[in-house]
Amino acid sequence: MQRYPTKQILVGNVKIGGDAPISVQSMTFAKTRDVKECLEQINRLYFAGCDIVRCAVFNKEDIVGLEQVKKESPLPIVADIHFNYSYAVAVSKFVDAIRINPGNIGGKDRIKAVVEACKERNIPIRIGVNSGSLEEQFENKYGRSVKGMVQSALYNIGLLEELEFTDIAVSLKSSDVYNTMQAYRELRPFTSYPFHLGVTEAGTTFHATIKSAIALGGLLLEGIGDTMRVSITGELEEEIKVARAILQDTGLQKSGLNIISCPTCGRLQSDLVSAIKIVEEKTKHIKEPLNVSVMGCVVNAIGEAKGADVAIAFGKGNGLVMRHGEVVARLKEHELVDRFLSEIDDEIKQRASNNG
């Protein structure tokens, strides 16, 4: 697919837009003034594969805490500002980017103060439009609609451009999947600033995964989007796991295993479900892009194996292990997974040797 060309901005050491890879973001839910807990969550996100983290600034104690957090964070920090523009001005001295909500940050004079502060340190601003908190002028005219979100974004982009500020990212979030997608689609032709994708208030893991896969995955397949967050209530690592899976399954991230497995049926004569769980757990650290298949019977296993780097075809009490469609071992069922994992390791080593 071809991505829409966008301006590239820099959040800390992470490039967003242009030809940069789609980055994954998340947000701490600890009180930012609780430096220890906030850093604990940031480190969890870092090891889960997050690229950028956002922290809420709710009061002056959060400003003090965030400065310390920034000193120790392994990830670039975006300050999330609502209502009080002076907090944005204060934290702009040390954070990597500012997110403002145009629905509650205040008028032109306040936005100007934030822009001037960000200019001094050359840090970007994300215009974070949210359907649940549109400016009164747009909600009164358009309601909490796609058009209202798009008009809010265009208006605020114009304000920043009038102040000669163009290090901008834009998000248009709704809890409604269709409205989220349409808002990004309708705004895209009118601006070349990078888009931060997300469905807001998406819920717990099950519903958030479905909503995000549809909305974010759909937009990414249309070439729309430069950075993203999967919002899941209270589940830090799951946000990153789901986001990375969306990127992999849309073909935008070539990292880790693409595991193909059958849904099982009446022909199954082995414990395929347990085998899959073991494979997922034992291979979650792998970064090398590999296609592997774990199939329960021979009906589709041979065909899938032809397109896989490494494959298992289970039978009744035994099965096959294959590399690039060729059988390398016929083993008893309890031996298959270990041999399969060994072949994956060997495939990775062989690639490294060939590339070295």
From Swiss-Prot:
GO terms (BP aspect): isopentenyl diphosphate biosynthetic process, methylerythritol 4-phosphate pathway; terpenoid biosynthetic process
Binding-site list for [4Fe-4S] cluster:
C262, C265, C297, E304
Species of origin:
Campylobacter fetus subsp. fetus (strain 82-40)
Q: What cofactor does this chain's UniProt record say it requires? A: [4Fe-4S] cluster
Kindly indicate whether the keyword ATP-binding belongs to this entry. no
Give the taxonomic lineage as stored in the record.
Bacteria, Pseudomonadati, Campylobacterota, Epsilonproteobacteria, Campylobacterales
Give GO terms: molecular function aspect only. 4 iron, 4 sulfur cluster binding; 4-hydroxy-3-methylbut-2-en-1-yl diphosphate synthase activity (ferredoxin); 4-hydroxy-3-methylbut-2-enyl-diphosphate synthase activity (flavodoxin); iron ion binding
Task: List UniProt keywords, sorted A-Z.
Answer: 4Fe-4S, Iron, Iron-sulfur, Isoprene biosynthesis, Metal-binding, Oxidoreductase
Please give the NCBIfam families that the UniProt record associates with this protein.
ispG_gcpE, PRK00366.1
Q: Which InterPro entries match?
A: Dihydropteroate_synth-like_sf (IPR011005), IspG_bac (IPR016425), IspG_bac-typ (IPR004588), NO2/SO3_Rdtase_4Fe4S_sf (IPR045854)
- What family does the Swiss-Prot or TrEMBL record give for this protein? Belongs to the IspG family.
> Which pathway?
Isoprenoid biosynthesis; isopentenyl diphosphate biosynthesis via DXP pathway; isopentenyl diphosphate from 1-deoxy-D-xylulose 5-phosphate: step 5/6
Q: What is this protein called?
A: 4-hydroxy-3-methylbut-2-en-1-yl diphosphate synthase (flavodoxin)
Pfam hit, one: GcpE
- Iron is among the record's keywords: yes
Cofactor note (record): Binds 1 [4Fe-4S] cluster.
Task: Indicate the segments annotated as coiled coil, or none if absent.
Answer: none
Q: Per its database record, what is this protein's job?
A: Converts 2C-methyl-D-erythritol 2,4-cyclodiphosphate (ME-2,4cPP) into 1-hydroxy-2-methyl-2-(E)-butenyl 4-diphosphate.
Enzyme Commission number(s): 1.17.7.3
Q: Output the superkingdom of the source species.
A: Bacteria
Q: Which reaction does it catalyse?
A: (2E)-4-hydroxy-3-methylbut-2-enyl diphosphate + oxidized [flavodoxin] + H2O + 2 H(+) = 2-C-methyl-D-erythritol 2,4-cyclic diphosphate + reduced [flavodoxin]
Top EC category:
oxidoreductase
PANTHER family, sorted: 4-HYDROXY-3-METHYLBUT-2-EN-1-YL DIPHOSPHATE SYNTHASE, 4-HYDROXY-3-METHYLBUT-2-EN-1-YL DIPHOSPHATE SYNTHASE (FERREDOXIN), CHLOROPLASTIC
